[in-house]
């Protein structure tokens, strides 16, 4: 009796190897085993330890896939052992396609491995179907954490235990990585995996940063009350149209010196650079603006008054002729004065028949008005007009004395 059963078992194993429907590396295999009719009532079903000691792994069996609709996944292998005792004699090809269950792959957990290994050693009275289902729509659905799902009905009124294995493309990490490019979308929430919201930073992405009001907003509202006379040069320029700014022309450089110009440039260069980087609420911006603006118009004016003794020596243009101690603040005035010592008169009158020459251009302009009769300076109190501004000033003094 035992020899006959062993021979029959060897035949069943060879038939099972020929009908095993799985390629190496494919994740989904449906196997249904049925009881042999002649051996359903045999009391010696589980008394073969030599057969149970050698489990057959599904990934070691190679065959041709029975269906074209099976999903091909090269990232998952099934390593659960299958109980190949003699009561599971043959595998029907109809059972492989009898009950396809569309289920969602669950997140991987340690309980799935232990449950699958324990299900392989169940009694022979309940046949087992090991499936791994992966669908294209599983990436957009909510994943369920339950590793074992038992169907209520099966073929011939028998229950089938479905062991669900996780599929890598539908894992929550891949779902989040696929949606990282769409920052405004919320990723799929998996019940068994906590979701950590992190800030994704990219060079071209501005929406991820928190926009807070800059110092420019607080400067235009509250800084005028806190510093009414100490506004920065850039703010006073936009409000008062250069009324409070020091003159930085060539004439003012000669009069007030290059130190005031360097201070004004230092105010414009140093002041806005840390201001544009400060972010916070409006009150902090106002306090910070008051603390980081040491240079103001009043401070530059005070420095200009206090620097007069030493700095004016650099701005003074002194005549170097013997016996002449005249001093000018402009180099053009000194050149015109030097012509009085040298006798040079480069400006000639172009009026026909006039041979007058002048050392200064303004003297030539005044002389030329005598020929033309132009009198641009008019008195506001009377109808008289003058060709020279100093003549008009003397005339207006007479009106004031009368």
Curated annotation (Swiss-Prot):
Gene3D superfamilies, alphabetically? Classic Zinc Finger
The signal sequence is: none
The record's listing under InterPro entries reads: Znf_C2H2_sf, Znf_C2H2_type
Question: Per the database entry, which stretches of residues form a coiled coil?
Answer: none
Sequence positions bearing N6-methylated lysine:
313
Its Gene Ontology cellular component terms are: cytosol; nucleoplasm
Picking any one GO biological process from the record gives: negative regulation of transcription by RNA polymerase II
Annotated compartments: Nucleus
Alphabetical keyword list: DNA-binding, Metal-binding, Methylation, Nucleus, Phosphoprotein, Repeat, Repressor, Transcription, Transcription regulation, Zinc, Zinc-finger
| Bias (Low complexity) | 89-144
One GO MF annotation is: RNA polymerase II cis-regulatory region sequence-specific DNA binding
UniProt motif 9aaTAD: location: 80-88
Keyword check for Transcription: yes
Segments of this protein annotated with the region Disordered: 81-144, 219-254
The segments annotated as C2H2-type zinc fingers are: 317-341, 347-371, 377-399
**At which residues is Phosphoserine found?**
202
The answer to whether UniProt assigns keyword Transferase to this entry is no
Function, in words? Confers strong transcriptional repression to the AP-2-alpha gene. Binds to a regulatory element (A32) in the AP-2-alpha gene promoter.
Q: Which family does it belong to?
A: Belongs to the Sp1 C2H2-type zinc-finger protein family.
What domain notes does the record hold?
The 9aaTAD motif is a transactivation domain present in a large number of yeast and animal transcription factors. In KLF12, the motif is inactive.
In its UniProt entry, what is this protein called? Krueppel-like factor 12
Species assigned in the record: Mus musculus (Mouse)
Q: What is the lineage of its organism?
A: Eukaryota, Metazoa, Chordata, Craniata, Vertebrata
């Amino acid at each position: 009796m035992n020899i006959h059963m062993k021979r029959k078992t060897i035949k069943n194993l060879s038939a099972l190897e020929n009908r095993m429907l799985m390629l190496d590396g494919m994740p989904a295999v449906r196997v249904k085993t049925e009881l042999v009719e002649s051996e359903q009532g045999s009391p010696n079903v589980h008394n073969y330890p030599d057969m149970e000691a050698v489990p057959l792994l599904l990934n070691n069996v190679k065959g041709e896939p029975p269906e074209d609709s099976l999903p091909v996944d090269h990232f998952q292998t099934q390593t659960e052992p299958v109980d190949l005792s003699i009561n599971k004699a043959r595998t029907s090809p109809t059972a492989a396609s009898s009950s396809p269950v569309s289920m969602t792959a669950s997140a991987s957990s340690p309980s799935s491995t232990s449950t699958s290994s324990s299900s392989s050693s169940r009694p022979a009275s309940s046949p087992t179907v090991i499936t791994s289902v992966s669908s294209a729509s599983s990436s957009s659905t909510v994943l369920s954490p339950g590793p074992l799902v038992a169907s209520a009905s099966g073929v011939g009124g028998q229950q089938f235990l479905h062991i669900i294995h996780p599929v890598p493309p539908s894992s929550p990490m891949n779902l989040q990585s696929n949606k990282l490019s769409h920052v405004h979308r919320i990723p799929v929430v998996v019940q068994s995996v906590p979701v950590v919201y992190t800030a994704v930073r990219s060079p071209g992405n501005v929406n991820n940063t928190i926009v807070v009001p800059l110092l420019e907003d607080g400067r235009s509202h509250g800084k005028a009350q806190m510093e009414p006379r100490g506004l920065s040069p850039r703010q006073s320029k936009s409000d008062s149209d250069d009324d409070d700014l020091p003159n930085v022309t060539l004439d003012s450089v000669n009069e007030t010196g290059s130190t005031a110009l360097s201070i004004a440039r230092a105010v414009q260069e140093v002041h806005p650079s840390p201001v544009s980087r400060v972010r916070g609420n409006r009150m902090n911006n106002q306090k910070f603006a008051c603390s980081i603006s040491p240079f103001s118009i009043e401070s530059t004016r005070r420095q200009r008054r206090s620097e007069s003794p030493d700095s004016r020596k650099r701005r003074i243009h002194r005549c170097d002729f013997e016996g002449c101690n005249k001093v000018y603040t402009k180099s053009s005035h000194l050149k015109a004065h030097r012509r009085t010592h040298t006798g040079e008169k480069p400006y000639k009158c172009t009026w026909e028949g006039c041979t007058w020459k002048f050392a200064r251009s303004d003297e030539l302009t005044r002389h030329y008005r005598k020929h033309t009769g132009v009198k641009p300076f008019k008195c506001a109190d009377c109808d008289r007009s003058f060709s020279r501004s100093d003549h008009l000033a003397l005339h207006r003094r007479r009106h004031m004395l009368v």
